[in-house]
């Protein structure tokens, strides 16, 4: 039997997609959460000098999206065929571009760097959010299933619904115009195993 071990910090952030895939699949795994003080001593022993990593029977896999794609394939939520898998990947890659665009704001919001978060919200976050979530709103409108791709949940549904929840917790105004995105978040987080996972997960700051 395969043993999975997820290594990250005590945060949701980039490891949360893997955790939610495990929860959806009902798959047992272990987790090691490093403190920021422990991290420098472990950094050189990771594939790319960053976290998260997923150890699969002791073999480390780096990069959060690679981990998500691997687990999604293992547990049947990567898309029902190659075309769907490519569509899922395209949406995930667009979402990753969006996160890169808004990272200056999110980094200040989380307290990792100093900065004027109100100005960054106005100049950086809101324009990028509205641009990209209009794309996502239109994709949901054209698919008709309530999911981003096909007729069933894929890993990109978990990825984006969690981010929407994070934004709802901090900034309702920016997301409230995207009705299908909000309905999608509710649909995904109402899935029994995801709902139970969210109700019982640690209360990390982000």
UniProtKB/Swiss-Prot annotation:
Its gene name is gst-6
Q: What is this protein called?
A: Probable glutathione S-transferase 6
Indicate the segments annotated as coiled coil, or none if absent: none
**What reaction gets catalysed by this protein?**
RX + glutathione = an S-substituted glutathione + a halide anion + H(+)
User: GST N-terminal domain location, by residue?
Assistant: 2-79
Tell me the keywords, alphabetical order.
Transferase
Q: What organism is this sequence from?
A: Caenorhabditis elegans
* Major enzyme class: transferase
Q: Which InterPro entries match?
A: Glutathione-S-Trfase_C-like, Glutathione-S-Trfase_C_sf, Glutathione_S-Trfase_N, GST_C, GST_superfamily, Thioredoxin-like_sf
Note one Pfam family from the annotation.
Answer: GST_C_3
Role played: Conjugation of reduced glutathione to a wide number of exogenous and endogenous hydrophobic electrophiles.
Q: Does the keyword Kinase apply?
A: no
**Taxonomy, superkingdom:** Eukaryota
**Where on this chain does glutathione bind?**
8, 39, 43, 49-51, 63-64
């Amino acid at each position: 039997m395969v043993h999975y071990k997820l290594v990250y910090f005590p945060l949701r952030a980039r490891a949360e997609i893997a955790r939610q895939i495990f929860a959806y699949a009902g798959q047992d795994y272990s987790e090691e959460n490093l403190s920021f003080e422990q991290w420098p001593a472990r950094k050189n022993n990771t594939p790319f000098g960053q976290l998260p990593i997923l150890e699969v029977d002791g073999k480390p896999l780096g990069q959060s999206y690679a981990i998500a794609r691997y687990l999604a394939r293992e547990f049947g939520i990567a898309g029902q065929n190659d075309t769907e898998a490519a569509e899922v990947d395209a949406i995930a890659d667009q979402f990753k571009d969006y996160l890169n665009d808004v990272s200056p704001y999110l980094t200040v919001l989380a307290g990792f760097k100093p900065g004027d978060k109100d100005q960054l919200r106005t100049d950086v976050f809101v324009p990028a959010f509205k641009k990209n979530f209009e794309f996502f709103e239109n994709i949901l409108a054209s698919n008709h299933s309530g999911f981003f791709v096909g007729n069933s949940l894929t890993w990109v549904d978990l990825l984006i619904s969690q981010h929407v929840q994070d934004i709802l917790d901090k900034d309702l105004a920016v997301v409230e115009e995207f009705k299908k995105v909000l309905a999608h978040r509710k649909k995904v987080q109402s899935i029994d195993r995801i709902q139970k996972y969210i109700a019982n997960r640690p209360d990390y700051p982000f």
